[in-house]
Amino acid sequence: MYERPDVPKLSANRNVIAAAVIAVVFVSVALLVTHLWRLANEHSKLGSSKLSDAIAAATVSPDAIAQVAEAAGVTPTGDTVEVVAFLVTADDDEKTLTGLNLAAIDDTQEKAALVSVPIDARVGTATASLASVYASGGAKGVTSQLAAGAVPVSHVVVMTESGWGAFMEAAQSGASALKRSATRLLDGIVLSDLDAQGLLDIGQRAASAGISADSVVGVPTAEASDAAGTYQQVDSAQLALAIGTMA
């Protein structure tokens, strides 16, 4: 059989070499993507460890809850309640607290509540308002005051006012809207211990349990006084009743 000298001969190793080259390319791309993903997460405001102190300060023992409940004449539910504290700040000043919303997901009763806490008030026996302690101590100041009032916090999300509005709109429209609004939500988040998937999961669970912008529960305040004058106070037991840790 005649073989043309100008046509290259096929090598038995040619396919093996090609496969090896492709494998190297895929591995290189995978390593690059992994590296970029790691860098993005390291510098991300989501899944941040900067809020670890705030969450650690929000731990409440069953005994503390029982003491507050006994003093108020109510009963601890014993339910497993996951509380996410959404600290809302001014769009133009992240150091100014303009709102505090607690999303309480009761896994035992399979229900949820969204509780709005007045930031110009003090919780329980606190000596300063929530807005004041945020200005001086950040998120930890707020969670510490809540914990002192027997209100545990599992997660903390600091958002701007526009970010909170986007979150509520998306949560009310369902899971698909949450995914579509990812960019708007991310832009409105200042800091969160939850990563993107965790935040999405909270939104979906809250929405499926019936939480919406129309279902926000307000906590009543009462006027109290000390040596410095009068102030507004949130009763710890009333707040616990609202989130479901007491009944």
PLM segments and residue spans:
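Non-catalytic, solvent-exposed segments at the cell envelope interface
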Residues: 2-247
